[in-house]
């Protein structure tokens, strides 16, 4: 790909200034169009060391309103990358609707550094697959993000000139700002690697723009033109991904579950004390092993999620866990991709994040109530599995619970809540409306359980008509998970 670039083309200063008078106005207008259309934009600048990324980005900022975008460098994110899944830092830095985020080196730099740095240094850089990169970018573009990727290509001669010039100008500051792998030491070694990267991640939704950077004026004009063109086109023709075309299937998991499991109060109290003591000790061991945990609870209204969470957390040190109640997204959360609010709540190593309702709302309530378009919730199954796979690969232990009660038991609990002044706060008009849609929700839950049950993030269906049994099953499942992860860690 790179060998096809014409590195000899040049633009005079006069011609550059003439074109920038028009192009600068286009860039400013394009930014305003994106803001008005609430179109979030990510611009990635990659390329050889010595490429003029900083000068290019600075020139672009002069043409736009700096209040509308942020600039980040993955070189400076290395310190926080090891404590979270690879894309965690990038999810936290997503642009809000109508805003722009610019990357002066991005996830591509970190992947290259991991693969090309000396063996004793590559552990400083997190690893990621091309598949996860493509999935990440596709999730964003499917959700109306515009992702623009530029690779600034230099000849080996020009690269050496640029590096020498920068080193003389900035001295030690240049080395401190660029603690990166030094491509200049072996240009021929890095060239095929970059070719492979570009080929593997040049996709329809987020294609690479290859820029000849030996002449900086020519490079800037080409980059700015492509940015203005892309934004103008994106605003005129908003992305509208096709719906999932797979044949509809009927899933039936819940009908095989007998929600009635017997357990006396005496048996419950005896085992509850035993399980909670065990869990207290295991939490300490998980913290020592620095294993993060994500536990998600889903289930029918009045299925007992709150009670199960209380018995679980009663055994835990409050400094080591956080319960995240998930409701409808608020004003801030609506500015981002639906997964954003979960990526930003991931636990630190050794800590536990408990979600009362989860990311699966995308394929349940958002599906049934029409908050997500068909193509949005249909693709969410694969998006969620990819997200959970990334968490698991990072070492996060994942437990997912569906608390199952039958329709008659739910009605009994609803009536009990309405009759008890101390419990009336637990029942809402929305609960009754959801009950009227039982069959639709049941179909959605069945599909969710089948399509997102994986070895790394399996579903546990909890028979919930007997609250005592349900609470103990949750505790025992978490205990088993902790013991298994500790055994794997010690292998």
Where are the language model's segments positioned?
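Glycine-rich phosphate-binding loop of ATP-dependent small-molecule kinases
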Residues: 1-491
């Amino acid at each position: 790909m790179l060998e096809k670039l014409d590195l000899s083309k040049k633009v005079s200063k006069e011609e550059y200034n003439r074109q920038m008078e028009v192009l600068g106005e286009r860039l400013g207008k394009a930014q305003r169009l994106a803001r008005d259309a609430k179109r979030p934009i990510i611009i990635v600048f990659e390329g050889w060391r010595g490429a003029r990324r900083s000068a290019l980005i600075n020139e672009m900022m002069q043409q736009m309103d700096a209040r509308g975008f942020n600039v980040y460098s993955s070189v400076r994110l290395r310190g926080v990358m090891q404590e979270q899944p690879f894309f965690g830092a990038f999810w936290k830095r997503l642009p809000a609707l109508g805003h722009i985020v610019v990357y002066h080196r991005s996830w591509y730099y970190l992947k290259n550094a991991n693969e090309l740095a000396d063996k004793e240094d590559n552990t400083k850089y997190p690893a990621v697959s091309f598949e996860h990169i493509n999935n990440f970018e596709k999730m964003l573009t499917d959700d109306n993000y515009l992702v623009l990727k530029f690779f600034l290509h230099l000849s080996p001669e020009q690269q050496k000139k640029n590096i020498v010039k920068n080193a003389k100008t900035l001295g030690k500051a240049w080395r401190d700002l660029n603690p990166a792998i030094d491509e200049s030491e072996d240009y021929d070694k890095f060239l095929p690697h970059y070719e492979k990267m570009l080929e593997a991640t040049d996709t329809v939704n987020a294609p690479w723009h290859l820029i000849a950077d030996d002449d900086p004026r020519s490079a800037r004009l080409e980059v700015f033109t492509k940015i203005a063109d892309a934004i103008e086109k994106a605003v005129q023709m908003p992305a509208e991904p096709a719906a999932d075309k797979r044949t509809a299937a009927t899933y039936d998991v819940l009908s095989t579950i007998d929600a009635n499991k017997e357990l006396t109060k005496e048996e419950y109290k005896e085992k509850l004390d035993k399980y909670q003591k065990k869990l207290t000790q295991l939490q300490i061991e998980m913290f020592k092993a620095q294993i993060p945990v994500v536990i998600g609870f889903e289930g029918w209204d009045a299925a007992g999620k709150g009670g199960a969470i209380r018995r679980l957390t009663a055994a835990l040190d409050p400094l080591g866990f956080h319960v995240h109640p998930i409701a409808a997204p608020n004003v801030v959360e609506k500015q981002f991709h639906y997964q954003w609010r979960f990526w930003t709540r991931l636990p630190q190593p050794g800590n536990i994040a408990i979600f009362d309702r989860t990311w699966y709302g995308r394929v349940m309530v958002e599906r049934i109530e029409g908050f997500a378009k068909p193509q949005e919730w249909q693709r969410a199954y694969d998006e969620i599995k990819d997200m959970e796979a990334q968490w698991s690969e990072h070492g996060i232990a994942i437990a997912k619970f569906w608390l199952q009660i039958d329709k008659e038991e739910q009605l009994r609990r609803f009536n009990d809540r309405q009759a008890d002044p101390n419990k009336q706060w637990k029942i809402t008009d929305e609960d009754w409306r959801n009950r009227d849609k039982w069959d639709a929700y049941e179909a959605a839950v069945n599909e969710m359980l089948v399509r997102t049950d994986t070895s790394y993030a399996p579903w546990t269906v909890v028979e919930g008509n007997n609250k005592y049994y349900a609470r103990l099953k949750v505790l025992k499942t978490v205990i088993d998970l902790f013991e298994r992860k500790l055994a794997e860690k010690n292998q």
